[in-house]
Curated annotation (Swiss-Prot):
Residues 145-167, 201-232 are annotated as: Disordered. Residues 209-218 have a biased composition (Acidic residues). This is Pre-mRNA-splicing factor isy1. The gene is isy1. Keywords: Cytoplasm, mRNA processing, mRNA splicing, Nucleus, Spliceosome. Belongs to the ISY1 family. Signal peptide: none annotated. One of its GO terms (biological process) is mRNA 3'-splice site recognition. It comes from the Eukaryota. It holds the Pfam family Isy1.
Length: 256
């Protein structure tokens, strides 16, 4: 009986493989998942590789629940799941860039190929199954829950800053906090801003008067000298005329 390596070298096997590649059909069971995700330029191929990654995630999430695993095995499994999550995100990014469906739209929740939601599959580094009960992890998750933050934010923070939504969730704030106030409609804010702008202009003008004269070779822009002349952009005809004059002067200098 021929070995698998000998079968792979046969003429018929290579012909069928080339024929399947030309038709866009890939047998995932006999093909390694490519590491260079951006090199795959077929949406069906990316869909199949993404499906394979989802199967591996689902299988490892089920395995991490086993009570016979040690803490080291649980940590290794959790690292592998997070690595697969990043790979899944890369495949989804490639699919979206090629014009395929946008799986990243619902990235807050992660589902396997059978439609079951995978708990803890959001953004950042996540803990799955028994990894949430590891020494140190459980305390960190409880502290993050009390602060109203995610575990990924809790890990990245050094304990000095406040995570996104941590303080806002515990305070009573209205629409004014998010910039939806009505102070612009009644003119209160606009009048205050105009007054502050006027004070800032007067302050700059006084500082400019106190400074020494402008250095040689420099001249103030129109509107900055306080002469009432506003700054005006030159028209296209004026720019072209200036460029022609400069070129004419350079030619005359070369001739002379």
């Amino acid at each position: 009986m021929a070995r698998n390596s000998e079968k792979a070298q046969s003429m018929l096997f290579r012909f069928r493989a080339q024929q399947a590649a030309d038709l866009g059909i890939i047998d995932i069971g006999r093909t390694r998942r490519p590491k260079a995700i951006t090199s795959v330029d077929s949406i069906p191929a990316c869909e199949k590789w993404r499906g394979q990654v989802l199967k591996e995630i689902s299988r490892k999430v089920s395995r991490i629940q086993e009570p016979s695993l040690s803490d080291h095995q649980i940590r290794d499994l959790n690292d592998e799941i997070n690595k697969l999550m990043r790979e899944k995100w890369a495949w989804e990014m490639q699919i979206r860039n090629m014009g395929g469906p946008n799986y990243m739209r619902g990235s807050g929740r992660v589902y396997d190929d059978e439609g079951r939601e995978i708990p803890g599959g959001g953004k950042g580094y996540r803990y799955f199954g028994r990894a949430r009960e590891l020494p140190g992890v459980k305390e960190m998750l409880e502290a993050a829950a009390r602060r109203g933050r995610g575990p990924a934010e809790e890990e990245e923070d050094d304990g000095k800053t406040v995570g996104r939504g941590g303080d806002i969730a515990t305070k009573k704030v209205d629409a004014n906090y998010f910039g939806y106030g009505l102070d612009e409609e009644d003119g209160t804010l606009l009048a205050y801003e105009m007054q502050r702008e006027k004070e800032a202009v007067e302050k700059l003008r006084k500082e400019g008067e106190d400074e020494e004269d402008v250095e040689d070779g420099w001249e103030p822009l129109p509107g900055d000298a306080g002469d009432g002349i506003e700054w005006r952009l030159p028209t296209l005809e004026e720019v072209q005329e200036e460029l022609v004059d400069r070129r004419r002067r350079r030619l005359l200098e070369k001739i002379s």
